[in-house]
Amino acid sequence: MGQKVNPVGLRLGINRTWDSRWFAARDYAVLLHQDLKLRKFLQGKLQAAGVSRIVIERPAKKARVTIHTARPGVVIGKKGADIEKLRGTLGTMAGGEVSLNIVEIRKPELDARLIAENIASQLERRVAFRRAMKRAVQSAMRLGAQGIRINCSGRLGGAEIARLEWYREGRVPLHTLRADIDYGTATAKTTYGTCGVKVWVFKGEILAHDPMAQDKRAMEQAPAR
């Protein structure tokens, strides 16, 4: 049943680590809700910045937020004005000091979350779903992906009956735990209703048993700002 489970959750502790990295005893529920609130706020505020991941760490009663984005300039703003304002807002929400790191995604065409969001925005603009899917697959394969699969479901093209369409190229070995598979979803809100987009990108195999392996790859590609 490897096809049914979330590929990220299945690989936690093998070649992928958690997006919230902290330990709490009594305050666990409070901090968890705080994390959810911070993520929701950032994803809404930075919609135009192409945010893929938000990592939250809590060393010594502080919060360290790392934003993985395709457009760091949009997050930072002119002379760093926007990022300072953002840091202040996050500090108020978290009730303490928050440090912000911005990590640039050099190849957004290989990031599953960004691919899904791009296809969803095209569906909202009434671009033909097959063309949007095919274009995304071609871009990913051209930039070095070993395999990609895209699922689009809902009232595609305004059809009366909802259905699922998928497109795949290359290998996407969901059962292989050492496979570096990136998974992302997005929702397109069209006039006919919502359409769901799921994307799996296979980037190769990670042979070392290292939960931080995927993060190290990302950091090698783009130094943090």
UniProtKB/Swiss-Prot annotation:
Gene3D superfamilies: 3.30.300.20, Ribosomal protein S3, C-terminal domain. Residues 38-106 form the KH type-2 domain. Pfam families: KH_2, Ribosomal_S3_C. InterPro entries: KH_dom (IPR004087), KH_dom-like_a/b (IPR015946), KH_dom_type_2 (IPR004044), KH_sf_prok-type (IPR009019), Ribosomal_S3_C_sf (IPR036419), Ribosomal_uS3_bac-typ (IPR005704), Ribosomal_uS3_C (IPR001351), Ribosomal_uS3_CS (IPR018280). Binds the lower part of the 30S subunit head. Binds mRNA in the 70S ribosome, positioning it for translation. Part of the 30S ribosomal subunit. Forms a tight complex with proteins S10 and S14. GO terms for biological process: translation. Belongs to the universal ribosomal protein uS3 family. Keywords: Ribonucleoprotein, Ribosomal protein, RNA-binding, rRNA-binding. It comes from the Bacteria. PANTHER family: 30S/40S RIBOSOMAL PROTEIN S3 (PTHR11760), SMALL RIBOSOMAL SUBUNIT PROTEIN US3C (PTHR11760:SF19). GO terms for molecular function: mRNA binding; rRNA binding; structural constituent of ribosome. This is Small ribosomal subunit protein uS3.
